Amino acid sequence: MAVKIQSDLDDILSLPVNEFFDYVRSIKYGYKDQDNDLHFLGDKDFKIYKYSFSTPEQLIHNNCGWCWDISELIKLYCRENGVACKSFFLEYLSNDFHHTHTQVLACINEKWSACPDNSMGTEIINPEFNTLGECFKWLKDSYIEYLKYVLDDNFDDLKLSVKEYDCIFNKNITEDEYLNLIRK
């Protein structure tokens, strides 16, 4: 079984960039729990978190993940294909609301763009920017716009954290272990 999963990963990593991101967008939005059960958006038990981080191999095998898992697959694709990229962790944490997002920004055809995942409606070339700084500003502004929409008058800039990250995650770590690593 491990050979087939590795073969699948190699096949995915060798796709042309547009086909790779079409594949990424097709991954079902959800997560694998500590018991290796899958939970999909819309399931009754979706919010009963016992999250377990999925490696790129597990993500492909399960065809299920969310931005934390998918960002690692995208970073691996970029590394394997010589694509410059940076990864960012965005978090809003208040007493009443907690939301996170990880996002990979990549330079493809000399333009920076937010890499598509299974939760955003972006395309690799739309929008695109001349510099990483412009792309990062768009990402941060878009996240703040989303938060203001959700929180209305309760949005507080001091509750927002945005940082570049480059840590390595072991398979099957918990949500708390993931957050402890990425927040460092």
PLM-predicted stretches and their roles:
Residues M1-N62, W66:
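Secondary-structure boundary elements
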Residues D69-K148:
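Hydrophobic/aromatic-rich core segments of domains that either
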Residues L9, K86-F89, E175-E177:
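Terminal low-complexity, poorly structured segments
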Residues F40, F46, I125, D156-D157:
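Intrinsically disordered, low-complexity, compositionally biased regions/tails
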Residues K140-K184:
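Alpha-helical and coiled-coil interaction segments, frequently adjacent to or embedded
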